[in-house]
Amino acid sequence: MAIRKKSTKSPPVLSHEFILQNHADIVSCVAMVFLLGLMFEITAKASIIFVTLQYNVTLPATEEQATESTSLYYYGIKDLATVFFYMLVAIIIHAIIQEYVLDKINRRMHFSKTKHSKFNESGQLSAFYLFSCIWGTFILISENYISDPTILWRAYPHNLMTFQMKFFYIAQLAYWFHAFPELYFQKTKKEDIPRQLVYIGLYLFHIAGAYLLNLNHLGLVLLVLHYFVEFLFHISRLFYFSDEKYQKGFSLWAVLFVLGRLLTLILSVLTVGFGLARAENQKLDFSAGNFNVLAVRIAVLASICITQAFMMWKFINFQLRRWREHSTFQAPVVKKKPTVTKGRSSRKGTENGVNGTVTSNGADSPRNRKEKSS
């Protein structure tokens, strides 16, 4: 494996190139400041806001729930500090995966610049989607979402969350916020930035919406479903870069993508359109976190439906482009045998090809001309 030679001239401190080359180390130092702040009593109160989850409530043990009391969490303005800290952690993890995994594979495969950037994007996203799917599935199983689907809308508002649930949403927001500085760190092309901003903005809009409107149960199920389909796409693209004949993963992804959009719409309509619409408490109450009113329900369903329609439109365009490229690349060349007839006209037609196309017999070889002259 070739070792990259480090340039003798180091860029000036705090210059553009210096920040790009050492951004992971700089961010690590900033994160370390918050962790060191926990060690001193004067700064511990401020540092703990960034590092640990805030707004916990301890519920006493009941007769149904034996033995121990439980700690639940709700959201507040201090969550922004926690999201900021874990955004720094996401930048560090991103750099570790890039340097110790993706860069090593890139040096072995010798990708072009276009494939290099797409491979890095799929490598980072496939790792994140896989981790989020496993984590989200664990929460779904531990909190009995699979055995009792009515928990999606029953006992709304779901303003109290378990530690795993709140930490999951904090991590999701932190990851997608970290994608903004990564556009600068990864030297994203100007023409690709608008597409990336729309992509990141849609994730933040829906995750933050589910978190703030106390629809965290529905949001978790939809995220796990969506992330699984996206993971399959990006892992298939990684295999495609190593072997361009690989198409099985894309075929499976195409089927699951459509099914995922249908399941998303069904679960959303079932939860918001029927479950919450039949709930007894339908009054807007900010203090209790109750947003179960007609206007909010319509806005939630409209945003989900518009997003799914936008994704289907992008999917159809993507599939049409792939099929068009595949058909032009593998278009069969039909060869017709020239009809041998007497006279000069048939010989002239053979030289010019059949039906305007040049064939393998389009011109006599020197050997044939010699035989004819003899």
Curated annotation (Swiss-Prot):
Membrane side Lumenal: residue ranges: 51-76, 143-159, 214-217, 273-297
Compositional bias segments (type: Polar residues): 352-363
Keyword Acetylation in record: no
Major localization listed first in the record, in broad terms: endoplasmic reticulum
The entry's keywords: Endoplasmic reticulum, Glycoprotein, Membrane, Phosphoprotein, Protein transport, Translocation, Transmembrane, Transmembrane helix, Transport
InterPro entries noted in UniProt: TLC-dom, Translocation_assoc_membrane
Compartments in which it is found: Endoplasmic reticulum membrane
Post-translational modification: N-glycosylated.
Superkingdom in the source lineage: Eukaryota
Location of the TLC domain: 117-326
Transmembrane segments: 30-50, 77-97, 122-142, 160-180, 193-213, 218-238, 252-272, 298-318
Bilayer topology annotation: Multi-pass membrane protein
Positions where Phosphoserine occurs in the chain: 365
Location of region: Disordered: 334-374
Positions of disulphide bridges: none
GO terms under biological process: protein insertion into ER membrane; response to unfolded protein; SRP-dependent cotranslational protein targeting to membrane, translocation
Any Gene Ontology CC annotation: endoplasmic reticulum membrane
Ranges per topology, Cytoplasmic: 2-29, 98-121, 181-192, 239-251, 319-374
Functional note: Involved in the translocation of nascent protein chains into or through the endoplasmic reticulum (ER) membrane by facilitating the proper chain positioning at the SEC61 channel. Regulates the exposure of nascent secretory protein chain to the cytosol during translocation into the ER. May affect the phospholipid bilayer in the vicinity of the lateral gate of the SEC61 channel, thereby facilitating ER protein transport. Intimately associates with transmembrane (TM) domain of nascent membrane proteins during the entire integration process into the ER membrane.
Quaternary structure and partners: Interacts with SEC61B. May interact with Derlin-1/DERL1.
Protein name (record): Translocating chain-associated membrane protein 1
Lineage, broadest ranks: Eukaryota, Metazoa, Chordata, Craniata, Vertebrata
